[in-house]
C-alpha cells in the first residue's frame, strides 16, 4: 500500500513540476540541465556496475558481499568525481557552452550519496520490504521536486534542477541509512569483488547500452540543433515518454524482486508477469492517448506559444512511453530469470539502431525526425524484448492476443472521441480539461463494453490490492 501511494504521489508531483517549471525556466535552461544529467548518467552507470542487481540476487554470505560492494562502489565514486571535471570540460567544448562544466561536477557528488544508499536499498528489496526502500527514496524525490520548483521561482535558472537533485539525493540517502540496520563497513574481499564485477559487468553493459539509446537523441539534438532546441525536446520527451513510463516504474519497482523470488517456480513467474502486463495495459495507453491528442492544448494553453515547437514531437513520442514500459517489464522478467545476456544483446541492438538513424533524421527533418527515429527504434527493440521474455516464461500469443486486441480498439475509439471534442475548442486550460474528461470517459466505457462490465471490477481489484 505504502509503495503504491508514494509512487502515485511521486508521479503527480513530477507532473506538477512539469506544469510549473516551463513557466519560470527557458528552453535553454532545460537544455543545459538535460545535457548535464546525460553526462552525469554516464558516470552513474560506471559507478553502479550492476551491483544492486547482484546484491538482490545473491543467496549466501550477504554481509561479506555487501561490504565488498560498498567499498567497491565508494572507491569508484571518488574516482569518477575527479573524472567529472574532465568530462565536464569535454562537454562544454563539444556543445560550445562553458556553463555545462560546473553542473556536471556538482551532480557527480550524488555518486557518493548513492554509494551509501545502495546496500540499505538492496537489503529492503531482498526482504520484499519495499516500503522501507520506497519511503526514503520517495521523500527524497519529493524534496527534490519542491526544492527545484522553489529555486526556479526564486530565479536560479538552470541551477534549480541541479541543486534540487542533490537536495533530494541527500534527504533520501540519509533516511535510507537511518531506517536500516546495515551500517557501512570497509571490508573488502578481492574474490567477492571479482564475482560482483563478473555478473554486474554484464548488467552494466546492458544498462550503458540502454543509456546510449535513451540519451543519443538528447546528444544529437543538442549538437546539431542547439541547446535551446534541446529544451523543447526535453519537455516533449517528459510528457510523451516519461508520463506513461512513470506507470511502468510503479510496477517495475517491485516486479524484479518478486520475480527473483519466484524464478524457480515457472508457473508463478508466468502469472506475475502476465498480471503486470494486464495492469499496465489497462492504464498506460490512456496516458499516451491523452498526450498525443491534447498536446496542443497542454503546450499552448499552459506554457504559451513560446513552447510551440514541442507540440509535434510530443505527439510523435507519446506511443514511445507505452512501448518503453512494456520493454521494462520484459527486461525485469529476463533479469529475474538469470538471462542478462539477452538484455545485453537487445540493449546494444537498440543503441546501434538509434545511433545509426537519429543523427541523419535530425539533420534532415529537425525535431520531427528525431521523434520518428526514436519511435522506430524503440518499436523494434520492444518487440524483441517482449518476445524473448514470452519465450522464457512459456507465454504464447493466445495468452496476450485478446488483451492486445481490446486495447487497440479502446485506444482508437477514445483517441477519436478526444480529438473530435478538443478540435472544437481553442487551445486553453478548459479545452485540456474537457478533452481529458472525454478521453477517460470513452476509454473506460469502451473497455467496459469489450469486457462485458469486468474492466472496472478488475481495475478496482488491482487498485485495492495495490493499496491494501
Regions found by a protein language model. Name each.
Residues 1-49, 77-88, 110, 140-149, ...:
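Signature of the first transmembrane helix
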Residues 1-11, 36, 45-89, 102-108, ...:
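Membrane-water interface segments that mark the loop-to-transmembrane alpha-helix transition
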Residues 15, 71-96, 102, 106, ...:
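Alpha-helical transmembrane segments of multi-pass membrane transport and lipid-handling proteins
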Residues 46-63, 125-126, 236, 240-284, ...:
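Helix-loop junctions and terminal segments of transmembrane helices
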Residues 54-63, 112-136, 154-159, 180, ...:
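Membrane-interface junctions at transmembrane-helix termini in multi-pass inner-membrane proteins
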Residues 101-108, 136-181, 198-200, 206, ...:
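Hydrophobic alpha-helical transmembrane segments
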Residues 131, 174-214, 219, 254-271, ...:
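Interhelical loop/hinge segments that connect adjacent transmembrane helices in multipass membrane
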Residues 395, 404, 418-468:
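Membrane-proximal transmembrane or re-entrant/amphipathic helices at the cytosolic face
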Amino acid at each position: 500500500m505504502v509503495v503504491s501511494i508514494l509512487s502515485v504521489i511521486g508521479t503527480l508531483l513530477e507532473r506538477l513540476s512539469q506544469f510549473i517549471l516551463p513557466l519560470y525556466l527557458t528552453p535553454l535552461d532545460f537544455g543545459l540541465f538535460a545535457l548535464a544529467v546525460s553526462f552525469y548518467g554516464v558516470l552513474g552507470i560506471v559507478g553502479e556496475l550492476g551491483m544492486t542487481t547482484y546484491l538482490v540476487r545473491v543467496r549466501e554470505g550477504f554481509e561479506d558481499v555487501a561490504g565488498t560492494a560498498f567499498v567497491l562502489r565508494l572507491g569508484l565514486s571518488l574516482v569518477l568525481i575527479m573524472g567529472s571535471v574532465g568530462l565536464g570540460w569535454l562537454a562544454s567544448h563539444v556543445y560550445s557552452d562553458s556553463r555545462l562544466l560546473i553542473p556536471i561536477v556538482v551532480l557527480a557528488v550524488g555518486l557518493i550519496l548513492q554509494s551509501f544508499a545502495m546496500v540499505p536499498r538492496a537489503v529492503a528489496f531482498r526482504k520484499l520490504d519495499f516500503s522501507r526502500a520506497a519511503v526514503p527514496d520517495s521523500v527524497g524525490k519529493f524534496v527534490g521536486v519542491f526544492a527545484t520548483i522553489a529555486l526556479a521561482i526564486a530565479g536560479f535558472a538552470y541551477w534549480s534542477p541541479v541543486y534540487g537533485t542533490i537536495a533530494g539525493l541527500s534527504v533520501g540517502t540519509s533516511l535510507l541509512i537511518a531506517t536500516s540496520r546495515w551500517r557501512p563497513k570497509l571490508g573488502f574481499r578481492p574474490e567477492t569483488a571479482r564475482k560482483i564485477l563478473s555478473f554486474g559487468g554484464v548488467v552494466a553493459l546492458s544498462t550503458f547500452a540502454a543509456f546510449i539509446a535513451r540519451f543519443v537523441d538528447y546528444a544529437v539534438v543538442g549538437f546539431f540543433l542547439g541547446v535551446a532546441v534541446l529544451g523543447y525536446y526535453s519537455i516533449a520527451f517528459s510528457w510523451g515518454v516519461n508520463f506513461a513510463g512513470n506507470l511502468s516504474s510503479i510496477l517495475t519497482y517491485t516486479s524484479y524482486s518478486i520475480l527473483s523470488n519466484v524464478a524457480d517456480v515457472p508457473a508463478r513467474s508466468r502469472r506475475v508477469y502476465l498480471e503486470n502486463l494486464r495492469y499496465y495495459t489497462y492504464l498506460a495507453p490512456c496516458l499516451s492517448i491523452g498526450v498525443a491528442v491534447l498536446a496542443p492544448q497542454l503546450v499552448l494553453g499552459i506554457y504559451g506559444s513560446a513552447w510551440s515547437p514541442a507540440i509535434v514531437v510530443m505527439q510523435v513520442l507519446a506511443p514511445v512511453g507505452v512501448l518503453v514500459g512494456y520493454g521494462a517489464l520484459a527486461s525485469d522478467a529476463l533479469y529475474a530469470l538469470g538471462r542478462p545476456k539477452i538484455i545485453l544483446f537487445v540493449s546494444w541492438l537498440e543503441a546501434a539502431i538509434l545511433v545509426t538513424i537519429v543523427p541523419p533524421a535530425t539533420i534532415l527533418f529537425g525535431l520531427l525526425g528525431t521523434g520518428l527515429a526514436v519511435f522506430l527504434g524503440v518499436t523494434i527493440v520492444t518487440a524483441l524484448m517482449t518476445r524473448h521474455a514470452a519465450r522464457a516464461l512459456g507465454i504464447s500469443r493466445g495468452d496476450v492476443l485478446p488483451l492486445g486486441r481490446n486495447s487497440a480498439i479502446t485506444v482508437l475509439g477514445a483517441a477519436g472521441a478526444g480529438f473530435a471534442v478538443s478540435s472544437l475548442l481553442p487551445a486553453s486550460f478548459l479545452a485540456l480539461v474537457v478533452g481529458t474528461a472525454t478521453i477517460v470517459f470513452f476509454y473506460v466505457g469502451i473497455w467496459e463494453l469489450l469486457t462485458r462490465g469486468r474492466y472496472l471490477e478488475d481495475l478496482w481489484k488491482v487498485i485495492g490490492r495495490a493499496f491494501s
